[in-house]
A protein has these predicted regions:
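A structural signal for multi-pass alpha-helical bundles of membrane permease subunits
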Residues: 4-300
Length: 300
């Protein structure tokens, strides 16, 4: 290997090294430290004299009979993720199909308006929707009572209504991402394919089934995977709209359950163990989903 090649490789390493150092500092080190904490009894009472306890914290996650427990929170997290993803994908693809029509004028204006929910910070979105769900003065109840003659709903007083309110908020917040991804995929489909299908007498449904969906799938599958991870780990909306899992801690997701265990009850070892379980759940899901849907295959 010549001196010139060595210098070139050293220069490349010199350029890449800062990024690697930042990656190690903000990702690798915290991840390894979290694993270490999950194997310890670290808590507020043992913040300095903590020691390793093996897998005890992991066992506690699955065996503690607290209310809510891991299983009820996990089930609610699955329901939350599935319902949100269904609405995100269906609404996003539907709106993308509308915006992709040539007959629609002012597409740029509509696109900007529809993207706004995703552009607004989650803190503002959560607090705005929380105000809209207010029992006495919220705009949601005002519309229900004045426009439709329905009784006002106590959105944030019972577990079911609060959970529905949180889902509505996150659906409004999350559909623009899927819409933008789907719109980009639709615009990359050659128009000649639709023209050939029309010449063969294909209906709108057959074009959607045999051309549109197969060709946007390689783009949508990674987007759905990302959306699943983001929704599964969404702390801000649940925490702010439901006021930290209220009422009676019945609207917790796994991620808010971790936050409360670690930073409200100061059970750092328990929270770290639960966060590692969440990581493993999402890792297994992502690898399985990407493999089963063949996301890396070319569309055409």
């Amino acid at each position: 290997m010549t001196t010139q090649v060595l210098k070139r490789k050293a220069f490349i390493f010199f350029l890449v090294a800062p990024a690697f150092l930042v990656l190690i500092g903000v990702v690798v080190y915290p991840f390894i430290f979290n694993i270490i904490i999950s194997l310890s009894n670290m808590s507020l009472a043992h913040i300095r004299d903590w020691h390793f306890v093996g897998l005890k914290q992991y066992v506690n996650v699955f065996t503690e009979e607290s209310k809510p427990n891991f299983y009820s929170v996990f089930l609610k997290t699955i329901i939350w993720t599935v319902v949100n993803l269904i609405f995100h994908v269906v609404l996003g693809v539907f709106l993308a199909l509308l915006l992709n029509q040539k007959e629609i004028r002012g597409k740029a204006i509509f696109r900007t308006i529809l993207v706004l929910p995703w552009a607004v910070p989650q803190l503002i979105v959560a607090l705005t929707w929380r105000g809209m769900f207010n029992y006495e003065y919220g705009s949601i109840n005002l519309m229900l009572t004045h426009w439709f003659g329905l009784p006002a709903v106590q959105w944030l007083k019972s577990p079911f209504e609060t959970f529905v309110a949180v889902i509505i908020t996150n659906v409004w917040l999350g559909y623009p991402f899927m819409m933008i991804i789907a719109l980009g995929a639709l615009q990359s489909i050659p128009h000649e394919l639709y023209e050939a299908a029309e010449m063969d007498g294909a209906s709108w449904f057959h074009k959607l089934k045999n051309i549109t969906i197969p060709l946007i799938r390689p783009v949508m599958v990674p987007a759905i995977t990302l959306g699943t991870i983001w929704t599964f780990n969404n702390l801000n909306i649940v925490w702010l709209v439901s006021n930290a899992g209220e009422p009676s801690d019945q609207t917790h997701l796994l991620v808010s359950f971790v936050y409360k265990a670690a930073f409200n009850f100061y059970r750092y070892g328990y929270g770290a163990a639960l966060s590692m379980i969440i990581f493993l759940i999402l890792l297994v899901f992502s690898l399985t989903f990407m493999r089963k849907t063949r996301a890396t295959e070319a569309a055409y």
